[in-house]
Amino acid sequence: MRTLGIDYGDSRVGIAITDPLGITAQGLETVNRNGSDKIILRKIDEIINEYNDIEVLVVGMPFNMDGTKTIRAEVTEKFIHKLKCKYNKIKIETIGNVDFKF
């Protein structure tokens, strides 16, 4: 069972994958969004087809240092909704990360 990690940013999206046992992860690539989720979804399709044992997609959810959602979190939630509609047979989870911008 592999997990695909997605760090969804304004201009770029980082993609990482675990080993077949789900123990370690390594970065696969960084994809330029060019203002479109179609590019990212196409890349995720390619990866899912290449690694046919991906069972979970994990998306980083940005939070402020006080634990509240950032403005970026709303955009990320919309992207997660697209993932859930497109990949309804793959479990989709979020993981919180803190926005350290000052």
Regions found by a protein language model. Give the residues of each.
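Phosphate- and other anionic-substrate recognition elements at nucleic-acid/protein interfaces
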Residues: R2-L4, S11-F102
